[in-house]
């Protein structure tokens, strides 16, 4: 059937609805099958899909999978019941990242701090609290103001006691707070940005999924620290990050889709200079090291100007990173494997799974 202008938005809407109901399950035992995975997660609701990702050649488990529930409420119930243990192993469930978002920097990083842009002068802390507390327990709320004038800079941060509210909020994308459209992103610290930058060269460190070599996390069957790969890791080929966790990179580079660094350029996470973006500057800088990258050097998606002083904390930048080669099939097929699109590695290679 030929796709029309009318069917494309309908398909996208259907896919987005499914995305809200899907969980990524990392750290699976190699003994875990679709049947045992399904049996475990059906305690929270009806599953419409369940898959353990396997190497297309050897059929060996890659140590992760996906489950899709019939409703978002069931997903919430499952996430509220963490930790999860399947076949004697504690696993890590996370809300699955949409295919079109998976190549963006920070998409797979687990954080508890949310960046909120588009904050107007009439928006106060209680507006943010009233809106976001339905997603989870809030630890702190910060609306950033100019030190001299006291005026709002148009953005702030909401910190939760868990990463799942942040994952859920950014997955939904569109939010209206106090009558104004808001932009929400994961907020990454300077340290987190630098850790991702260093991933392209395979230098030390831990991104929260395991130790450096030979131990810790278990997100892939490879001998080299599991989650970041080895010879048979998360994305096949060189693994999920090849020595660190560059999310699919080749030997020390290549990362999210084959460009040098995490999204092209020289500096990894957005290329170029320190911080997030391609130039210096900062996202509303001068406030306890918040900002970083080139946020604020111009309008931010029509939400206003966020000033240009240098600083160190900022949102996950949007835009396409890693070449934008569309991943085939419901579980990808490109930007998770070595070099980018459609390879035999990837989040499923060329096949459906």
Swiss-Prot record:
Sequence segments annotated as region (Nuclear targeting sequence): 308-347
* Keyword Acetylation among record annotations: yes
Note the effect listed for residue 336 to S.
Slightly affects hydrogel-binding
UniProt's post-translational modification comment states:
Sumoylated in exosomes, promoting miRNAs-binding.
The PTM Asymmetric dimethylarginine maps to: 203, 213, 266
Tell me what happens on changing residue 276 to S. Answer: Impairs hydrogel-binding
Q: Changing residue 269 to S: what effect?
A: Does not affect hydrogel-binding
Instruction: Spell out which residues are annotated as carrying Omega-N-methylarginine.
Output: 38, 203, 213, 228, 238, 266, 325, 350
Using the record's annotations, give every residue carrying the modification Dimethylated arginine. Answer: 203, 213
Site of covalent link Glycyl lysine isopeptide (Lys-Gly) (interchain with G-Cter in SUMO2): 22, 104, 112, 120, 137, 152, 168, 173, 186
Residues bearing Phosphothreonine? 4, 140, 159, 176
What changing residue 287 to S does, per the record, is: Does not affect hydrogel-binding
Task: Provide the gene name from the record.
Answer: HNRNPA2B1
Residue numbers of N6-acetyllysine PTMs? 168, 173
> According to the UniProt entry, which residues carry N6,N6-dimethyllysine?
104
Query: Which positions are tagged coiled coil?
Result: none
Gly residues bias: start-end ranges: 202-223, 320-353
What happens after mutating residue 321 to S?
Answer: Impairs hydrogel-binding
Name of the featured protein: Heterogeneous nuclear ribonucleoproteins A2/B1
Question: Has the keyword Transcription been applied to this entry?
Answer: no
Question: Which residues are annotated with the PTM N-acetylmethionine?
Answer: 1
Renumbered residue ranges of the record's region Disordered? 193-353
- Implicated disorder: Inclusion body myopathy with early-onset Paget disease with or without frontotemporal dementia 2: An autosomal dominant disease characterized by disabling muscle weakness clinically resembling to limb girdle muscular dystrophy, osteolytic bone lesions consistent with Paget disease, and premature frontotemporal dementia. Clinical features show incomplete penetrance. Oculopharyngeal muscular dystrophy 2: An autosomal dominant, early-onset myopathy characterized by progressive muscle weakness, ptosis, ophthalmoplegia, dysphagia, and variable degrees of respiratory insufficiency.
